[in-house]
Amino acid sequence: MFSLEGGHAAATRLIRAGATGIVCASDPLALGAIRAARRAGLSVPADISVVGYDDSAFMSCTDPPLTTVRQPIEAIGRAAVAMLAGQIEGAAVSAEELFFEPEIVARGSTAAAPVKPRVLA
C-alpha cells in the first residue's frame, strides 16, 4: 500500500475525479502519484500538486523536487530514550502526551491550483 504502485493506483483514481492536489502518507506514494499524473498527461505542479511525507533521502533530487513533510525524528528519538531511561530507573509511566511539530519542506512539486478546469480524455 505504501509503495510507488499503491501511490500510482490511488492517484489515478483521484486524477480521474479532477483532483488538483494530492497529499500522500509517504514519499514513495508521492512518487507514484507523480508517475500517475505524468501518464495522464498532466504536469506537476502546473496541473496538479503532490506532497509526500517523511522527507526521505533524495527527495530534493527528484523531478520535480518533492514537497514533503519532515518529522522531527531526532527530537522524537531523544524523547523516547528519555522516557525509556526513566522507566528503567523505576520512574512511573507517564500518561503525558508529547507533541512534535512537523515541518513543510516546500520544493518544486506544489503550486497554486490551476485557474482553468482541465478535461481528461
Language-model segments: residues:
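Structural motif
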Residues: 1-16
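Flexible loop/turn connectors
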Residues: 14-121
